[in-house]
């Protein structure tokens, strides 16, 4: 096999083996008896071969040093390539994220363009917008959830039914047959009862009848007339109707003022 097809390591090992063989022949010829020594011509050829192998060894060692430097440069280049690969992968991930963001933005932009085109095809006058805004303000609705759509019953404020179902809406009704009263009024009743007891039966301060007014589950207010007289129903509808009329009048005035301002 030609030496050019061998690696540098194999060539070095082959040269060292040749030098070892030549050196062994020279040493054996030196210590051999005179009758067994080789001729001077053969000895000279072995010496020339040894010198040639030595030069070849030095050249191969120089080549190995050059190859070691090249290998070092290759390692440095591999490290740079690895770092560049990491940067490329990071940039690729960022490009993927940017592509996704751009795709989302384009989709949303197309939706907005479609909405604009639809709005341009069916324009709405300012008077209609003012009327619709007035309807919203008349119902005390100032905003709606972000996900609100046509037909959604949700409002940003509690309705009358929700307020009546709450604890505050039931504070003036009977619960389990007992009236809910303010703690201060209960304390005053106890103090009045104790004062009457201290003054005696002939005192000037009349005894206040507890539970004189009571709400029935039907919503009517009843006043107790005594132990044997029973109770009398009080009509509060007139006051409620008057309050409702006042509210309607105020709402009508505010509506007319809003319409005049908008015009």
Curated annotation (Swiss-Prot):
One of its GO terms (cellular component) is mediator complex. Disulfide bonds: none annotated. The keyword Coiled coil applies. Residues 209-228, 235-263 are annotated as: Disordered. The keyword Transit peptide does not apply. It is found in: Nucleus. Residues 61-111 form a coiled coil. It comes from the Eukaryota. GO terms for biological process: regulation of transcription by RNA polymerase II. GO terms for molecular function: transcription coregulator activity. Its main location: nucleus. Keywords: Activator, Coiled coil, Nucleus, Transcription, Transcription regulation. Residues 251-263 have a biased composition (Low complexity). InterPro entries: Mediator_Med4. Component of the Mediator complex. Component of the Mediator complex, a coactivator involved in the regulated transcription of nearly all RNA polymerase II-dependent genes. Mediator functions as a bridge to convey information from gene-specific regulatory proteins to the basal RNA polymerase II transcription machinery. Mediator is recruited to promoters by direct interactions with regulatory proteins and serves as a scaffold for the assembly of a functional preinitiation complex with RNA polymerase II and the general transcription factors. Belongs to the Mediator complex subunit 4 family. This is Mediator of RNA polymerase II transcription subunit 4. The gene is MED4.
């Amino acid at each position: 096999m030609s030496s050019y097809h061998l690696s540098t390591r194999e060539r070095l090992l082959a040269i060292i083996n040749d030098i070892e063989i030549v050196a062994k022949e020279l040493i054996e010829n030196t210590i051999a008896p005179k009758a067994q020594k080789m001729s001077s011509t053969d000895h000279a050829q072995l010496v020339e071969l040894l010198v040639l192998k030595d030069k070849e060894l030095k050249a191969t060692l120089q080549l190995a040093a050059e190859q070691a430097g090249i290998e070092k440069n290759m390692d440095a280049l591999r490290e740079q390539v690895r770092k560049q690969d990491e940067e490329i992968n990071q940039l690729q991930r960022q490009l993927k994220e940017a592509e996704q963001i751009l795709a989302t933005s384009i989709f949303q932009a197309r939706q907005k363009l479609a909405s604009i085109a639809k709005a341009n095809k069916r324009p709405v006058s300012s008077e209609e917008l003012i009327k619709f805004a007035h309807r919203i303000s008349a119902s005390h609705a100032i905003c709606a959830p972000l996900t609100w759509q046509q037909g959604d019953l949700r409002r940003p404020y509690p309705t009358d039914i929700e307020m009546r179902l709450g604890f505050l809406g039931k504070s003036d009704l009977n619960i389990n047959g007992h009236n809910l009263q303010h703690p201060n009024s209960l304390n005053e009743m106890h103090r009045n009862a104790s004062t009457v007891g201290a003054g005696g039966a002939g005192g000037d301060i009349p005894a206040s009848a507890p539970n004189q007014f009571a709400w029935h589950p039907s919503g009517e207010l009843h006043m107790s007339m005594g132990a044997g007289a029973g109770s009398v129903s009080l009509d509060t509808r007139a006051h409620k109707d008057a309050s409702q009329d006042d509210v309607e009048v105020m709402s009508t005035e505010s509506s007319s003022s809003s319409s005049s301002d908008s015009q």
